Amino acid sequence: MVFALFFVTGALFGQGFKFGVKFDPVITWLRSDVSDVLPEQARLGFDLGLTADFYLARNYAFATGMTLYNTGGTLKYTSGITNFRAKNGNVPIEPHGKVTYNVQYVKIPVAMKLKTHLIGRFVYSANLGFDPMIRVSAKGNFNNETNMSVSDEINFLNMGWHIGIGTEYSLGGEVAFFCGLSVMNTFVDMTKPMHDRITSNNLFFRIGVIF
């Protein structure tokens, strides 16, 4: 259905619309605003899905799409948690216990994209925008449990902002390979407990094809 929507939109906009697919490896670092919740190691995830550029002028586009964004990380709770909410009920996390989160969101970026003219077979671009996200899955490893549902600990909505650069290499006609780097920082608390605020820094290695 999503593919059909993009193709219909492309037919309506003609040369003013570009459709793409991408698979971005992502490195995530969690951040905490309290001293008793400590982020541990970074986590490798991915951002997979569709891109759509609606051109307002030759070198300016409204950039959006829909992707499945896999993220997470490990938090160390130095004071412990008395009522960590998991699928099997409220469980305690001992002092200095760790929880590794594996969270998936549907992400719908909203951005402005600026592009150069064609230079040889290359086009260079920069983009800046926001990233609304809807949680679709949240699992965690804790207390010797693995892949346990922890949806009750993770907020349903999240939001970030991003800035990125990239390049497109023409493969002939309307088809181009693209790659680039993008940084996204979230500013909405990922977890539900009110005593802390967990956000993330993310580095995206952008890879895809534009049609």
PLM features: what roles do these ranges have?
Residues 31-37, 74-81, 138-146, 190-196:
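Outer-membrane beta-barrel translocator domains and adjoining extracellular loop/strand segments
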Residues 37-39, 97-101, 150-155, 192-196:
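Outer-membrane beta-barrel domain signature
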Residues 13-53, 210:
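Short glycine/proline- and aromatic-enriched beta-strand/turn motifs that initiate or cap beta-hairpins
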Residues 71-77, 152, 158-211:
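Predominantly the C-terminal beta-signal and adjacent terminal strand-loop region
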